[in-house]
Amino acid sequence: MNNTEFHELVDAKLQLLEDMIDDSGADIEPIITGNVLTLEFENRSQIVINKQEPMHEIWLASKSGGFHFAYTDEKWTCSKTGVEFIEMVKEECQKHADEVIQWA
């Protein structure tokens, strides 16, 4: 994968994530600054997601720790847990929000 393909794939995944957050009605504020997407919660906790172009990875930092996602078999998978990116974000959002989020 070249850098252009990497950015296209990540941008599409992050847009999907933002749409899912909007559709959920959860009190989560997505803030984009450069290559970083910060999800801020009502309790002021944050999940930070960023593009790591040199490694072609997505990195996620939350109160559960740091996670790296690589694109294999047409999905972003965590190198530590094997969990798919969107599933991990959903789990972490519920931990940060301290409530069940109704994902569409």
From Swiss-Prot:
MF annotations from Gene Ontology: ferric iron binding; ferrous iron binding
Keyword DNA repair: no
SMART domains tied to this protein: Frataxin_Cyay
InterPro entries: CyaY, Frataxin/CyaY, Frataxin/CyaY_sf, Frataxin_CS
Pfam family, one: Frataxin_Cyay
PROSITE patterns, per the entry: FRATAXIN_1, FRATAXIN_2
Gene Ontology biological process terms in this record: iron-sulfur cluster assembly
Keywords: Iron, Metal-binding
Domain of life: Bacteria
Record-level GO cellular component terms: cytosol
Tagged with keyword Transmembrane: no
PANTHER family according to UniProt: FRATAXIN, FRATAXIN, MITOCHONDRIAL
Family: Belongs to the frataxin family.
Function, in words: Involved in iron-sulfur (Fe-S) cluster assembly. May act as a regulator of Fe-S biogenesis.
Name of this chain's protein: Iron-sulfur cluster assembly protein CyaY
Organism: Aliivibrio salmonicida (strain LFI1238) (Vibrio salmonicida (strain LFI1238))
Gene symbol of the encoding locus: cyaY
